[in-house]
Amino acid sequence: MSSPAPTLFDSSPIDAHTFLAEYWQQKPLLIRQALPGAEAQIDREQLFTLAESEDVESRVVTQSDDSWRVIEGPFHPGVISAHEPGQSLLVQAVDLWSPKVAQLKEAFNFLPSWRIDDIMVSYASDEGGVGPHFDYYDVFLIQGAGKRRWELGGTCDEHTALIEGAPLKLLSDFKPINEYILEPGDMLYLPPGIAHNGTAMGHSITLSVGFRSPTRAELFDDLATDLLLESANHHYRDPLLTPQDAGHELRDAVIDQVQALLKEVVNDRDRLADWFARYMTTPKYPDVETVVPEHREMHHQGKRYINGFEDSDD
């Protein structure tokens, strides 16, 4: 019988239940040696090779004093230097190109699998980083090779001031509150909105496990697109009209009709669940053939959804 997959809490004083109740989407958590051996999952030469492919999403961020520059991949061989200080290479969805990196997702089996977006891997030369910023999604920062200093600030939102004209969404007034130095195997969890700034201490590789967190606008946009594929048999109908309704006035009764028409969709839980399951299991790169086949799965009331479709196989 195979042994259970390791989790982040095998060498931690807390367990998954405590983490979900007290930390998940609430406050940061540092776990030393959460994933020992993480530095062996991928090296910088493998990252450089991935960044040369047109099928792989990558970018290089360089910092010089207070100036930032971002260059999108793919990159020609030799363009990325391991010796230029203040440089960072970021490669998205490395879990789709490296079986070893993909195995790291097993450590997060205490969370819904369909919430995981991808594992981004970044290589940085000495003093490299992407600047102080915050994310709208949960992220686990796992230290691979080398060391990285992480400074954490307060909670941010859409009203937090950013540096104008910067190629990245960088915080204009970042005030560190806590500082951690991560070594190979260490893990730092950050909930959405926490300001953070990572700086390489020598050559450094960080693996970032990010989670899908669609905005309300994105949800409505996809739901509306999904509705367009249905037969157009639900039309707006007027409330009871009187001659006094002629002219330009918008009556509350009309808004009630519109609201009722839209509520038919959001109040239909089965319909909503079917759409959401297909939406959240849609592959990140549906048209790209990857080394590790992209597999996103969700179950709901006896139905199984795989990669954006309900699976009819028993």
Model-derived segments and their meaning:
Residues 2-22, 35-186, 194, 199-235:
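Active-site region of the double-stranded beta-helix
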Residues 2-8, 171-181, 197-314:
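Fe(II)/2-oxoglutarate
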